[in-house]
Amino acid sequence: MPVHWVDKLVAELEAKLQNRGKDEYIFNGGLSVSGLQHIGRLRGEVLLGEAVRRELEKRGFRVKQLLTLYTVDPWKGKDEQRREFPDPKAAERYVGWPLDRVPDPKGCHASWVDHFWSDFGPYIGVFTDGKIEVVTTRELYKGRLKEFITTMVLPRRDEIRRVINKYRGRKPYQEGWIPLEPRCARCGRIDSTEALEILGGERVRYRCSYCGYQGESSIEDSKLNWRIEWAGVWWSLGVDFEPYGKDHATPGGSRDSAAELARLLGFEPPEGVWYEWVSLRAGGREADMSSSGFTGITPREWLDIAHPQILRFIYFLHPPTRRVVVDLSEIPSYYSQYYRAERIYFGIEEASTVEETRYLARTYELSHPSNPPAKPPSQIPYSHAAIVAQVVGPERLWTDGLERLKRAGLLGHDEYSIRWAKELLEKAYKWARRYAPKHLKFEIPDSPPEDALRRIEKPDLLEKLAEVLESVEEWSEERIKQALVEFGEGMSSSERRRFYRDFYLAIVGRPEGPRAAPLLSLMDRGFVVDRLRKAANLSRELKGR
């Protein structure tokens, strides 16, 4: 693998920023809070800029990172959006309203924006170093964007119209066009009004094509044409670097049009890099994560089941122009990849090439919102944590759960490892309940269910297994695995399948479950032996009735 893409991007950007000659550089990202604020939005609009910022800060640059929420965009009222309301039909009245004026469909926040931002905004500091400031276009329209409109856009609106018409193709704007969309005082829409006249430089007269109303509005209660608005945000904030999604990256597309408008108005557009979407795979199907389409999971939901370092690792492992597919059933695999990079970082393991070793070590370093641990921490396989969590139950994760991990030799005594283990047990338990494959999702009933006992074919084998396990010299995964292999010697493949079917019926009450050796090693030996004997005896009794 070559030099890490983050370092390559930093090297390219460093010279370009120096040419701008500023004391402080502004990095920005942009989000429209049109619905579900999913983890895909962290990739390009938050984490990419954060990684570059932090590296430039190490080189002596002063950088301020912003995240702009486009809260004045019109609410489109897609089916998925309307279904968030108790009465989707009644919600049609909000179509065209500014996003921050649409009510919260669940009634727990002040607005649509506040509701859906609540699962994203408060968690930015968990996924990053926290040095990111959030601004909204609503705030900007009351200040710098208003100034941008009155001093730069309106005096040159005919030149702006000609630039935009180059990119529009169909339905070019006619002479006299005013690039403002006032909010209608009667119906509340901002997507159906036509600005007719500027009054005294501060107000605008308009007509609404939806309800027919004519009236006046302040400029700050209006919205710019979106291409001009993008350039206006750059100017208002003084943006020097801003990543953008692939939908804006087409040659001659929206990014190019905003950049041309910026140069027309006398300032340079920010440096940028485009990024690919993040997709979600579930049930064998893949779909791009979508805010207004309500596809994906939020940062809050991710933190329920995995550490922020894991998502950062996934994102920084791949260049931003590479598509990333997240599958929540694969969380254990993501942890395994992260742990391998951790071993490589600490020199415990090497990859197949020097280049790959360096790349993975660097990716691991970037995966930490702060600094990596000072020494190699314990590495608890995620699937093991899921097994332990289900064995002990949610109330005993930090007591019995930690103790079982220690007995299994999976947990050290350093503060970092213990904190990680506590968090991991909680996350793995929730993952097992929500996303785990069927064979990893189980409960240990107090007593084997009667229907399971009736299905046990050879209770004598379970009793013999109990004797073998009782005499295992060391209750560890490796020794248990060895004992199980030896116990199954001489069985045909079909006999071995039936034996394990009986085993799982006795232990978890189902004909399948997690791999036997890890499962047993994380349970008490005495419980396992007693359980197998009890299941064998009860099974024989039921069959003898």
Swiss-Prot record:
Its EC number is 6.1.1.6. It is an enzyme of class 6 (ligase). One of its GO terms (biological process) is lysyl-tRNA aminoacylation. GO terms for cellular component: cytoplasm. A motif ('KMSKS' region) lies at residues 288-292. A motif ('HIGH' region) lies at residues 33-41. It catalyses: tRNA(Lys) + L-lysine + ATP = L-lysyl-tRNA(Lys) + AMP + diphosphate. InterPro entries: aa-tRNA-synth_I_cd-bd, aa-tRNA-synth_I_codon-bd_sub2, aa_tRNA-synth_I_cd-bd_sf, Lys-tRNA-ligase, Rossmann-like_a/b/a_fold. One of its GO terms (molecular function) is tRNA binding. It holds the Pfam family Anticodon_2. It is found in: Cytoplasm. Keywords: Aminoacyl-tRNA synthetase, ATP-binding, Cytoplasm, Ligase, Nucleotide-binding, Protein biosynthesis. PANTHER family: LYSINE--TRNA LIGASE (PTHR37940:SF1). Belongs to the class-I aminoacyl-tRNA synthetase family. HAMAP family: Lys_tRNA_synth_class1. This is Lysine--tRNA ligase. It comes from Aeropyrum pernix (strain ATCC 700893 / DSM 11879 / JCM 9820 / NBRC 100138 / K1). The gene is lysS.
